[in-house]
């Protein structure tokens, strides 16, 4: 499954156990822990990530599911204008894969905390 359209990186409320995890609960697929590079912050009380290939690594989850393309318009609406969907690399079990992620456009902090 090397198609980024069938992979989604989640790091906040959509992650397993998160308050909005129910939006992905109906999909069949495989969850794996992963690492992503960038800056982590918050916006309106929710985690917000900005991709930076030179930034520190942060823990996240990767969902691989053939059903993702079908629900992405719904997720785009849910995330709204505060987030944009990008394709970035994620490190999963020692190898890099390309996957989609919702990156925050805004932050409540002046500078994203590199260690968050």
Task: Annotate each PLM feature.
Residues 1-116:
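Glycine-aromatic micro-motifs
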